């Protein structure tokens, strides 16, 4: 077949050859059919390179058509071989290596033991039958040397081991420690709102005083605590710590109220009377040796004595005060000799001068 599509010759060697009118190279002249028999590459129109290329393509096509075998998929025997071992050393090196491995094993064993010991040290074993109060007891070297009956037993009384003197019985509800406070006078807001409050404060105070008087010197009705502390003792009296005694006031100062008793407590009336008597006795002893006064001077002193009054000063001492002249005299000196009292009066210098002038005028007239 020529370039127009005609067949040039018949079949050669059993291969149907068809000339491609669009061929570029002589290798394209030969177009194989799908059901052709084994090819003959002795084509006089093909050169050596075209023949080799055609052979390789046919081989690759045949390989693609069939599945790979197990050996091809698994690889070569060299690839399947394990990793080569190290070469064995001499006998001396073997012993050294054995010792080295043994040393490693022993070191690992020691490390494991040390770790176990450290863990056992950090983990503190809690003592048995020990609560928080037992741990707080510093008398025991390692804590919890013995069990204490403490506040936990108030919530769990069944834990109490000592039934005679137990901490639960230290403050019973009706014991003396819970009744010392007395009645409180705190007002309730609800009582005021609903009208349950007593309006009269005096009656409320009176009721409180009556209750206190009733509770005073009353024997304690609780026998549990008393029998636990002091058996067969029922003479403990009850007292009220809020009862106030009568305050004793001293001399009143200007703007400061009563004194603070820094110089001692104020004297009683009986002590003041006894002090006056003692001063009178001392003055009588001193004046017993002195000259007796004349009768006119005694009369003058008796008249002035009627106008004198005992006055308590700021310091607490007694002084004489003249009502008419508002003159203050020296402390009282009373004598009980001839039936009258001699009082030495302190006079101002101005009064003495006036009296002297009056006496001179009267003497000139005579």
From Swiss-Prot:
It holds the Pfam family Pal1. Residues 1-135, 313-366 are annotated as: Disordered. There is a cross-link at residues 78, 187, 242 (Glycyl lysine isopeptide (Lys-Gly) (interchain with G-Cter in ubiquitin)). Residues 26-38, 316-327, 339-349 have a biased composition (Basic and acidic residues). Residues 97-108, 353-366 have a biased composition (Basic residues). Keywords: Cytoplasm, Isopeptide bond, Nucleus, Phosphoprotein, Ubl conjugation. Residues 328-338 have a biased composition (Polar residues). GO terms for cellular component: actin cortical patch; cytoplasm; nuclear periphery; nucleus. This is Uncharacterized protein YHR097C. It comes from Saccharomyces cerevisiae (strain ATCC 204508 / S288c) (Baker's yeast).
